[in-house]
Amino acid sequence: MKLTIAKSAGYCFGVKRAVNMVYQEAEEAKVPVYTYGPIIHNEEVVRDLKQRGVHVVRELKELENLPKGKIIIRSHGISRREHEAMKACGFEVLDATCPFVLKIHRLVEKYSKEGYRIVIAGNEHHPEVEGILGWVEDRKST
């Protein structure tokens, strides 16, 4: 049997960028390093990062009891409210949101402010969809 691996096999560039950012911070940071949610849906990578001292924060309220440090936003992105809450807690926020996802955030923010209704096809509980919806001013549908 012949096995052929597609040229595009592996992580997209946004995920690679986010994972590389966390590994770099884990090696260089002089303060605690956290990720908001697992940086990637890959338990092996998450486990390796944990061994390097990176902790996963699953809810914003956890930040209140953690030593201040750097928190890295995963490639899925987050809502405006979450972003502001992280800064308000005194953490240095490093944004590893995929540039394509950031573009979507800016577009839904712009068009929702102009009165457009934003409709997103997807699982409303998926972190990327939650993040996108978090930049919609008012009217939205999923």
Model-derived features with residue positions:
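Conserved small/polar residues in nucleotide/adenosyl-binding loops
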Residues: 142
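Conserved phosphate/anionic-ligand binding catalytic regions in large, soluble enzymes, centered on
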Residues: 8-22
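Short internal beta-strands
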Residues: 32-39, 120-122
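Short acidic low-complexity segments
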Residues: 56-66
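N-terminal beta-loop-helix "entrance" segment that forms/cooperates
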Residues: 37-54
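Ser/Thr/Gly-rich flexible loops in soluble cytosolic domains mediating phosphotransfer, phosphorylation
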Residues: 89-116, 120-124
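Generic N-terminal amphipathic, Lys/Arg-enriched alpha-helix
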Residues: 1-10, 28, 32
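Conserved phosphate/oxyanion-binding catalytic-loop motifs
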Residues: 74-79
